[in-house]
Amino acid sequence: MQLEPNFWQTKSLLEMTESEWEALCDGCGKCCYRKYIQGRGKRQKLYYTRIACNLLDLETGKCGNYSERFNIETDCTKLTKKNLPDFHWLPDTCAYRLLYEGKTLPEWHPLISGSPHSVKNADILIKNGIHERDVIDWFEFIIDEDHTFK
């Protein structure tokens, strides 16, 4: 299906077709890396790790079994129009989060650059990822934390 040019600038996330919605994903794979929350209230922090879902191809940032991911990885989260308010856990580079927050897509996003390789060329992919099955202690793999997480 042909996408309308610059559809993300003329439509809200709620107005997008399924094809447009899927096209927003830049393929960085960051949403497939494990995160955890520690603390409560004002002391609550969101920790990002370099621990990847076992289905994630660490080189490309793509799911190894996209069509069956929810059957294989039961904790895989489907981003939908219904869970838009929960997007605060997504990386600050994520198109879904950016558009939900009223921001623009970055120049390296494939919809802007026209290249599926622009994410890798812009150094957006997580380096030295490791699959969850190979990890014992998650604390060794923290790469960032979000103090403003709510």
UniProtKB/Swiss-Prot annotation:
**InterPro entries per UniProt:** Puta_zinc/iron-chelating_dom, UCP006173
Cysteines engaged in disulfide bonds, as pairs: none
Lineage top rank: taxon:
Bacteria
**Which family does the record assign?**
Belongs to the UPF0260 family.
Its name, as the record gives it, is UPF0260 protein CGSHiEE_04300
User: What is the protein's species of origin?
Assistant: Haemophilus influenzae (strain PittEE)
Q: What is the lineage of its organism?
A: Bacteria, Pseudomonadati, Pseudomonadota, Gammaproteobacteria, Pasteurellales
